[in-house]
């Protein structure tokens, strides 16, 4: 307040000095000091008289201002320019939108679990993962991010992993409010509780799911601190049709899951319009699973972006990809792509146990055939399976395939045992087995990599699929 009064007095003094200078009146000094009040000679007009006339133009050279006392210029609103600059500095910056890195999720191979090694650009599908309603929101309205999901996301992003997140819509405090007297689930994952029904408080579930997607969508608004790139892919539950005596993921019928899918889809898209929503993984193409999913697909148009199928130790060569493609087509999803989010190569039911070498052979033919039938991403279950999986040889086969053709940009089945993969480098990779041979158009030396990763150079005309192998024509990808 004192500084403002001093400034006003100083301005008045300067005005007096300027008026006298313009009228030619003599003062005691040749120049007017900013600290001296000028005297007014007799017979001259007073400053008050001057103020009644038109504005006075003050020559710049007339007034000398002590620079140590000069005040910053003010704008037309009277605000100090320095204050304006400071206000501008403190205005919040526009949200920084994070881009999806080109090297994240560039591979068509993924793995069930929380980490991956052996190839770059791969996908993970944590199972069950940490995106459980009651784990993140242990009490209504109270969120715990840091030690449930943030730490995991930080680690995934330090390793440049693409993630498919499974959403679990269960919180014990919610289920207890309306489902406490219903049968309990058997074999549920830890952290989910024992009642796995449709949320009692739908609005609370929507609020939670919206907050989850918002925290990791990378739009610069309410994001996780330190987020490097968005999480975009969300799967609504897992195998909801699995309701057996040993394993249960959901305790409701098809119509209930359809309702859950619709509600979840809207919530996810409201937080992130660029998100990709997958239906919960269909456990297989066996009739009991098809019967559960048929009415869902008939009512789910516009409520999922990618189909989702599983194949666990089935006798189906291509992990149900062909059958599932037909299933989607028949139910109005002809243009919808799909992923195989669980692929376990194992001995099919009622068949003689296969050796590790046989399982490794099936691994190469299964992945190649599934991609050829339309699968876009395939997640290897491998050792994540409670049985231990098909063994280290099969794991090696998946790794070699991911390294060699994982970033393919096109795939074409040329025969039932000959598949062509187009690579971004311009090279071509063929996968062949059961004594298949290369097309006649291929000649010269080619690189041959068998299902165990053994590599050599051969003449194209001499190559045959006596065992499953990949043939690289052109520069190695």
Enumerate the language-model features and the residues they cover.
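Active-site cleft segment of glycoside hydrolase catalytic domains centered on the general acid/base Glu
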Residues: 179-304, 311-327, 331, 348-365, ...
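Aromatic- and carboxylate-lined catalytic core of secreted/periplasmic carbohydrate-active enzymes
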Residues: 360, 364-439, 452-455, 464-470
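Bacterial N-terminal signal peptides
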Residues: 9-19
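Ser/Thr-rich, Proline-interspersed low-complexity disordered segments
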Residues: 22-95
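Bacterial N-terminal signal peptides that target proteins for export
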Residues: 1-9
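Conserved, mostly hydrophobic/aromatic
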Residues: 156, 212, 234, 264, ...
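Structural recognition of the beta-strand scaffold that forms the well-ordered cores
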Residues: 103-108, 122-132, 162-167, 232-236, ...
């Amino acid at each position: 307040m004192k500084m403002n009064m001093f400034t006003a007095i100083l301005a008045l003094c300067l005005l007096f000095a300027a008026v006298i200078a313009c009228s030619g009146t003599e003062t005691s000094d040749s120049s007017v000091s900013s600290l001296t009040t000028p005297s007014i000679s007799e017979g001259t007009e007073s400053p008050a008289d001057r103020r009644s006339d038109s504005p006075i133009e003050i020559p710049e050279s007339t007034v000398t201002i002590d620079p140590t006392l000069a005040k910053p210029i003010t704008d037309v609103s009277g605000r100090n320019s320095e204050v304006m600059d400071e206000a501008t500095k403190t205005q919040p910056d526009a949200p920084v939108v994070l881009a999806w890195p080109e090297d994240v999720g560039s591979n068509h191979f993924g793995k069930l679990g929380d980490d991956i090694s052996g190839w770059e650009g791969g996908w993970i599908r944590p199972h069950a993962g940490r995106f459980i309603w009651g784990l993140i929101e242990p009490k209504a309205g109270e969120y715990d991010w840091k030690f449930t999901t943030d730490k995991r996301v930080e680690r995934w992003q330090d390793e440049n992993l693409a993630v498919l997140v499974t959403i679990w819509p269960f919180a014990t405090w919610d289920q207890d409010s309306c489902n406490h007297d219903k049968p309990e689930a058997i074999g549920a994952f830890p952290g989910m509780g024992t009642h796995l029904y449709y949320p009692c408080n739908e609005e609370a579930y929507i609020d939670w799911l919206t907050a989850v997607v918002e925290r990791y969508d990378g739009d610069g608004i309410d994001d996780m601190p330190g987020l490097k790139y968005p999480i975009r892919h969300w799967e609504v539950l897992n195998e909801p049709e699995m309701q057996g005596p040993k394993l249960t993921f959901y305790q409701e019928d098809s119509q209930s899951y359809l309702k859950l899918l619709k509600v979840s889809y809207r919530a996810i898209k409201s937080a992130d319009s660029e998100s990709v929503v997958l239906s919960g993984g269909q456990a297989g193409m066996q009739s009991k699973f098809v019967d559960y999913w048929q009415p869902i697909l008939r009512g789910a148009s516009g409520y999922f972006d990618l189909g989702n199928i599983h194949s666990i130790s089935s006798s189906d060569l291509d992990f149900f990809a062909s059958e599932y493609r037909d299933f989607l087509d028949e139910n109005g999803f002809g243009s919808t792509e799909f992923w195989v989010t669980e692929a376990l190569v194992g001995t099919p039911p009622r068949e003689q146990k296969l050796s590790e070498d046989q399982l490794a052979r099936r691994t190469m033919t299964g992945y190649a055939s599934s991609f050829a039938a339309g699968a876009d991403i395939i997640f290897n279950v491998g050792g994540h399976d409670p049985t231990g999986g098909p063994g280290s040889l099969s794991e090696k086969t998946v790794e070699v395939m991911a390294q060699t053709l994982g970033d393919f940009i096109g795939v074409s089945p040329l025969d039932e045992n000959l598949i062509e993969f187009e690579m971004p480098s311009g090279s071509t990779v063929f996968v062949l087995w059961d004594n298949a041979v290369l097309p006649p158009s291929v000649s010269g030396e080619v690189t041959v990599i068998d299902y165990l990763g053994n590599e050599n150079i051969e003449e194209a005309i001499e190559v045959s699929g006596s065992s499953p192998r990949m043939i690289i024509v052109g520069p190695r990808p």
